[in-house]
Amino acid sequence: MIELFYASTPNGRKISIMLEETKIKYKITPINLNKDEQLKPEFLKINPYGKIPAIIDHEKNLVLIESGAILIYLAKKSNQFLPEKNEIKIFEWLMFQISNVGPILGQLHHFSHFNPGKSLYSEERFYKGALKVYAALNNQLKKNK
């Protein structure tokens, strides 16, 4: 059984969706970020960086952090979504999501909605970055129709 330490964030949802799709048995341990539960000593033993998601595979006594590593682990554990002939291209797009899509859209959301000082520079910078990300994704999707 997999234990998922979860909050309803994009990274948390990635893992819960993968668990549902793979039909791997799991249980959710909710982590309330608004109450700083990710910074409590018992959670820091699981992830010293105090971030979600994290999983424990109780069958293997394995703790994993970082959404990309967890997604790869779940794909390999379930023998799904990671065909050997396309593995490197799958990793390429996973890394694109981890290093571009997530951070840029996350920063755009943050600076557009939560920045108390309102920074037009930041909003415009991440908006332009988001346009580049969406253009790259659209171009790839067009190639694979």
What does each model-identified segment do?
Residues 134-145:
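Hydrophobic alpha-helical bundle segments that form small-molecule/ligand-binding pockets
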